[in-house]
C-alpha cells in the first residue's frame, strides 16, 4: 500500500515542481517583456548642448523641454551618445574634459581629461574621438564669426599649435592616444567600413585623413584657400564626402576613393552643419550666416529649397522617425522644429541659450551623428 501511495504522490510532487518552475519562468518572461515594452514605450528624446545652461532634454513626442542637465558652467559644446543611449558624452570647453553623463539621472559619472578647448565629439566602434585646440582660447564666437565682431578679420595664426584629436577607449574611459591634426579642427566623419577617419581643418583649409584605430596619417586634402572647411558628411552610398566651406559659401563633393574634389556647389552664407536625410534622397545644409537651412538633391546636388530658421544655426538632427528636423540655433537660444517633408515650421523650443549641438535617442541622422 505504501509503495502504491509513493508512486502516486511522486508524480504529483514532480507536477507541482514543474508547475512552480513554469510559473516562475513565465513570471520572469512577463517581467522582462514588460520592461522591454516600457523601454520601447519611453518617449524618444533629443539632447541639446547649451553653452550657458547645460544640456537640454527634449521630449520628442510632446516637443517640449522637460529638463536640463546642470553642466552649464562647463561650457558644453560637442556631444555624442553611446550605442544604447545610456551615456551622453559632452565636450566641456571650460573644464577641458569629456563629461560622461548618465542619461537616466543626468549626473556626470566620469570625466576624461582631454586638453584645452575641446569641441567636437564622435562615437564610433566603442571609441570616442574628441577634437581640442591647444592654441585656442575658446569662448563663444564673436558676432559675424570674426574676432571682436569685425567681418573679414583673420583669426588664423600658423604659429599656434595645431589641433589634436583625443581617442578615448569607452571601456576604460582613458585617452589611448592623441593625434595631431591641422589648425582649428571642426568636423569628424568616418568611411563606411569605419576604418578611415576624416577631419576638417578650418584654420588651414584642409581635410586630414587617418586610420581610425591607430591615428596614423593617410593623406591631407588641400581645399580652396580661405574656404574654412567645417561640416563633413559621407554620402549614403559611401562614394563621396560632402564638406562645407564656410567663408566661400559653398560645399564640395570629394570622391571617397581618390580624395579628389569632383564638384563644387554654391550655398547661402556661412554653411556649417551638413547631413543627408534619412532616405538619402536629399542633402541638408545649415547656412548659419543666412539664417537658412538649404535642401539639395542627394544625388545631383541641385538646389531644391531654402528654409528660414533662427540665428547661428550650426547643427541639426532629424527625429528618429525622420518626420521632423530639429535645428539648434545658438543666437536665437532655441531649437527650431520643422516638418522634414514640406519644411513648414512647427514650433520653437526656447530656454537654450547659445544652443550648440543636438543628437537624439533612438539614434537618428544629423550633422553630428550619422546612422
Residue ranges of model-derived segments:
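N-terminal secretory signal peptides that target proteins for export/translocation
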Residues: 1-18
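Bacterial N-terminal signal peptides
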Residues: 16-37
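Predominantly soluble domains enriched in secretory-pathway, periplasmic, or organellar proteins
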Residues: 40-371
Amino acid at each position: 500500500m505504501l509503495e502504491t501511495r509513493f508512486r502516486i504522490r511522486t508524480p504529483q510532487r514532480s507536477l507541482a515542481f514543474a508547475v512552480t518552475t513554469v510559473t516562475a519562468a513565465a513570471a520572469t518572461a512577463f517581467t522582462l517583456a514588460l520592461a522591454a515594452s516600457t523601454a520601447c514605450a519611453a518617449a524618444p528624446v533629443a539632447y541639446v548642448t547649451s553653452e550657458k545652461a547645460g544640456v537640454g532634454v527634449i521630449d520628442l513626442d510632446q516637443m517640449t523641454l522637460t529638463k536640463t542637465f546642470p553642466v552649464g558652467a562647463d561650457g558644453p559644446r560637442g556631444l555624442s551618445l553611446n550605442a544604447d543611449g545610456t551615456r551622453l558624452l559632452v565636450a566641456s570647453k571650460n573644464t577641458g574634459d569629456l563629461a560622461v553623463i548618465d542619461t537616466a539621472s543626468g549626473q556626470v559619472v566620469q570625466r576624461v581629461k582631454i586638453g584645452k578647448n575641446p569641441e567636437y565629439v564622435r562615437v564610433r566602434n566603442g571609441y570616442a574621438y574628441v577634437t581640442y585646440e591647444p592654441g585656442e582660447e575658446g569662448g563663444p564666437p564673436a558676432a559675424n564669426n570674426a574676432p571682436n565682431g569685425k567681418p573679414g578679420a583673420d583669426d588664423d595664426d600658423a604659429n599656434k599649435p595645431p589641433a589634436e584629436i583625443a581617442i578615448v577607449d569607452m571601456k576604460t574611459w582613458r585617452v589611448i592616444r592623441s593625434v595631431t591634426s591641422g589648425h582649428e579642427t571642426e568636423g569628424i566623419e568616418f568611411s563606411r567600413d569605419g576604418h578611415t577617419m576624416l577631419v576638417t581643418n578650418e584654420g588651414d583649409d584642409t581635410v586630414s585623413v587617418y586610420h581610425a584605430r591607430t591615428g596614423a596619417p593617410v593623406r591631407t586634402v588641400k581645399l580652396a584657400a580661405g574656404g574654412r572647411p567645417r561640416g563633413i558628411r559621407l554620402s549614403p552610398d559611401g562614394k563621396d564626402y560632402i564638406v562645407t566651406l564656410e567663408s566661400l559659401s559653398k560645399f564640395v563633393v570629394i570622391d571617397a576613393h581618390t580624395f579628389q574634389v569632383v564638384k563644387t556647389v554654391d550655398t547661402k552664407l556661412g554653411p556649417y552643419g551638413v547631413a543627408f536625410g534619412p532616405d538619402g534622397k536629399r542633402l541638408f545644409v545649415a547656412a548659419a550666416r543666412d539664417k537658412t537651412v538649404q535642401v539639395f538633391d542627394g544625388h545631383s546636388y541641385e538646389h531644391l529649397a531654402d528654409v528660414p530658421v533662427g540665428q547661428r544655426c550650426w547643427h541639426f538632427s532629424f527625429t528618429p522617425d525622420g518626420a521632423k528636423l530639429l535645428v539648434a540655433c545658438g543666437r536665437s537660444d532655441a531649437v527650431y522644429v520643422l516638418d522634414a517633408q514640406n519644411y513648414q515650421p512647427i514650433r520653437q523650443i526656447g530656454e537654450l541659450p547659445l544652443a550648440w549641438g543636438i543628437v537624439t535617442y533612438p539614434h537618428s541622422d544629423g550633422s553630428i551623428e550619422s546612422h
